[in-house]
Amino acid sequence: STALGPTQDHTGYGQQTPSPAQIPLSPVVRAGDFVFISGQVPVLDGSIVTGGFAAETRAVLDNVKATLKLVGSEMSDVVKTTVWLRDRDDFPDFNAAYAEYFPSNPPARSTAESRLMIDIAVEIDAIAYKPL
């Protein structure tokens, strides 16, 4: 496979979810052998998931998994995640839930405390490597 050059195209897949708002982004983009997942949030059927921090984290990771599936990829293909937590005190609980989805050979990861765009506790984006 060849490297993606500056003039090569990428392909976006899916429609922006979960909000009916017209947000200019693709949930997932394939660029060569790389798959880029836009920030996923804890929303199911248009509503923010309830049940506490662990439930939100699992919902986000389920959304990452479902979005990867759109391009024939899976969690084991993820090589990097970026995580935003509303409260750094949630870090231990986040790690426990995250480990359920990446039980061995977890991807590289950056985690930051941040005020998020909607009233949620966690958002995650991901980069996967899945050769064509």
Regions of interest found by a model, annotated:
Residues 1-62, 66-79, 85-132:
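N-terminal presequence-like segments and the immediate start of the first folded domain
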